[in-house]
Every structure is written in structure tokens, then in C-alpha cells.
């Protein structure tokens, strides 16, 4: 029998974490290409270390991109604007090594085939209003609030930071928050006492549901003691190293492919978005309390080689009917995914921090639940939709 009483932990990082800086620069490049050339092909990687940014990849486009200017603008938006922080977007060096996409790949993609082989997963559950796992959703809430507090007056905070939230489950359902960890870069001058008090009052208390935090909830703030050296000065940042933060916090499987810096012809990204769209609509329709979808592709081939639906014993109708309904309602070729989710818009930099899923902004088309009625009808299920979904 599956465990029903357990602890589950997920982490999030702020936009100023060096790996997330790399993701945002890569996606800013993608947005700049799509804004000028919707047929552009982008596979952009970024690396950051003390004082410099390196942008590399394969980009085929008619767009004119000022890579150094673009990278520095992203760094400054994040908040690294002074050498005192260990990184300065005004003065950092930018090295560019960009080539065109291989024509061997292009010949398959241009006729609507997948840009690579691989398997992608989507997941949804009824633990939160956003139909996301509670641990990752609450971890993101903490890091978003940390950034908001930094911009809202806590000037001793710096852009780099992380959170970790452990949720206690009883009977398979969220019962309480057991542990919260917050680590944030800060100025040399701020005292630990002032920092801890501010983070408890302005970050943790405002980010997490009060009904889930009790006197037994453990809170750790900068457990190593101090966190003055951070950002790219403290750690090298590389695109695609926070794929679990980007998705479901470890709850639900991951195919291994990163998202940022990839145009929608790369099914690593677009099919993972479609997987989330499908799973969320299954849960929103009331067909299951938990749903995971796997799709897999061969490079240059349009139709997926496999589609699987897993509901972990929570289905309200036979799982085979849900799987058949998914095939009837959703188009799963790269072309159908791109058109159905309107993925050729320059919206990707926003996805590159605080998760690609569970977001409420209108740009996140894969978060819509507009297929729930069609799914319910196709599955033949007389079930009640999730409230508010």
C-alpha cells in the first residue's frame, strides 16, 4: 500500500540565483528573437561567473540581437547593479559564441517534426488552487516574497536566495508545514538579529498560509550563519540546472530536458507545457485528484511515439477512458501544440524564475482549464469539476 502519512520537501530559488540568472538571459534572447522572427530557431545557453556573462548556442534567425546589451539589461532588472553585490550589470563583460542551427536538424523540424527525441512529463493535483503540489508552490511563494521584500524596502537584502519547504501529509492530504528554510544573500553590515526578524515578519509570515504554520513548524534562516558573497561571485550560473525548481519540486517525474533558451520546436519545452495543460485539465474536470502525463517523441517525427496517463489510484472513471479522452481532445504534434498554446509569443523570460507551472499570469496559456468540459464529455464521466478551476 502507498504511504499516506509522510513529509515531502521542495525547494525554490530567487531570480538572483546564478542558475536562474542564466535561465533568464537565455529566455530573454529567445523573446528577442520571437519578437522579430516567429520562425527563428533558438538553442541558447548562458554561463555566468564573477564579472562576466557567456552566451553560446545555435540560433538561426533574421532578427538582429544585441546580445551584450540584452544580457546586461537582464542582470540589472534582477538587481545586480553594484560591485558591492559581487556583480554589476553596468560593467560586466559579455562573451558571445553563437552559431546557426544544424541543417540536419532543420530539415526535420521545418516540416513539423519534433526538434529532438525524448520523453516529457506533465503533472497536476488538487492540493492547491493552482492545482500544483503544495511543497513547490509554497517554496515559490517564499522566494517571490523574498524578492518583493528586497524591492520594497529591505535594502540589506541581495538578489541571490533560496527557500525550502517541507509539508506534512496525513492520509495523503496536506496537513501542515513542518519546516521552512530561507537562505538569502545580504549586505555585510546587517546584523543576524535584524535579518532574521525581517525575514520572519516580511517574508515567511506573508508568504505561507497561516493555517498550515504552527508552533511546531521549524524555521531555519541562513543556517550557515552569514551569506554575504553570493550570485555569480559565489557560484557559477548555467542555463538548465534548476529543472526540478522549474517544474513540480520532485513530485511527479521529469524527462530530464531543460526549458530555458529553447524555442517551441524543441519538445523538451513545448511538450512539457502540453503535458501540464493536459494534466491540469484532467484534474480540473474532476476526472482524477492527481494526474501525470508522459509524451515521447522521435526527432523529425510529428506524432508522439507514446502517450501515457497515470492517476495514482485517484481516477473517478477508468483510467483507460481518460487516456482515450486525452487523445481525442488534445493535438500532440509539435505544430498542434505550438498553435494550440500560442507558443510563438515573446513570453519566456517571465517563465524563467519562480516556476513554469502554477502561475496565474495570462501569458501562461498552458495553465488554462478550458478543455475540462470537453475532457469530461469525452471520458463519459458524470463527475464534478474542481471548484474555481
Curated annotation (Swiss-Prot):
It is found in: Cytoplasm. It comes from the Bacteria. L-methionine binds at residues 58, 101, 235, 266. One of its GO terms (cellular component) is cytoplasm. K(+) binds at residue 45. The keyword Metal-binding applies. It is an enzyme of class 2 (transferase). HAMAP family: S_AdoMet_synth1. Belongs to the AdoMet synthase family. This is S-adenosylmethionine synthase. One of its GO terms (biological process) is S-adenosylmethionine biosynthetic process. Homotetramer; dimer of dimers. The keyword DNA damage does not apply. It comes from Anaeromyxobacter sp. (strain Fw109-5). Its cofactor is Mg(2+); K(+). GO terms for molecular function: ATP binding; magnesium ion binding; methionine adenosyltransferase activity. Pfam families: S-AdoMet_synt_C, S-AdoMet_synt_M, S-AdoMet_synt_N. Catalyzes the formation of S-adenosylmethionine (AdoMet) from methionine and ATP. The overall synthetic reaction is composed of two sequential steps, AdoMet formation and the subsequent tripolyphosphate hydrolysis which occurs prior to release of AdoMet from the enzyme. Binds 2 divalent ions per subunit. It catalyses: L-methionine + ATP + H2O = S-adenosyl-L-methionine + phosphate + diphosphate. Residues 101-111 are annotated as: Flexible loop. Its EC number is 2.5.1.6. ATP binds at residues 17, 160-162, 226-227, 235, 241-242, 258, 262. Mg(2+) binds at residue 19.
